[in-house]
Each structure stands twice: as structure tokens, then as C-alpha cells.
Amino acid sequence: MSEVKLLGIEEIEQEVFTRWDITGHQVNRHMLSKALTGTEGVVLDQITFPPGFVHHMHRHPHADMVVIPLSGVVQFLGVPGSPIEVSPGHVLVIPRGNWHEISNVGTVDSEVLHFFTGVGAVDDIGYEAYQQQGQAAPPLGGGR
């Protein structure tokens, strides 16, 4: 039997995350995973998206994604679709395999709880950047 754990969010180390398909950076606190806490079937991060942040169009083939804003507003864009503002009081559910882009078009940081379900480790989520005819992902609001 696993033991009960009480985690202080401020005690969890922050990781500044950048990559070729991200405009700006995000700040992650890895909170739940099989390796960290013994939880199976869910990966949970607290993520801060600074103003101007964009994680360009991509998908996760092996995990459903859930985003719960704690502060600020994030903008979600699917393919096809129109931008949707997601703010505190909302729960955004993105089923596995769905193309999506998330950005902070506001003037203050957006902080979210970010879950992947059906997996116990980040490496199991799967990741594919959006490519069409050799082009990079479309910009937010790019009409796809």
C-alpha cells in the first residue's frame, strides 16, 4: 500500500522549459507521476505561462490532457477551430490525438494545473508537432 503524501507546492522544484516549437518559455512544477509519487495513470504539473507564450500546434497520441486555469487566461486553438479563452472556473479537456495550441495572449502570467491521464510518466504521453506540406505549425488564429 502506498503512503499518504502532503506536498507543499512551493517546495517542488521549478523547471524552466523551452523548445523549438515554443515561443517564449513555460515554468513547470512536476507534482504527480509514477516516479515522483507512485501515482499511476496520471501526470500532473503546475505550469506558468508568461505573457506572449505560445506552445504551437501539436498533439499527444497516448494521453488525454486536462487544463484547469488557476489565474490569468489561456487561449486554446484546435484544428479546425476558432480560439477559445479558458479562465479560472473552466476545465479544458483535450482527448488524446487532438491537435491543439495553447497561448497566453494576456498581460499577466497564466497559471494552470495540467494533467495527462492514462499514463504514469511524461515519456509515455507521446508528442507530435503539427506539420503540413513541410510547414511549421500555423500561428494562433491561422485559420486552420
Where are the model-predicted features located?
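A short hydrophobic beta-strand segment most commonly corresponding to one strand
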Residues: 46-47, 93, 108-124
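Asparagine-centered strand-capping/turn motif at beta-strand->loop junctions
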Residues: 103-106
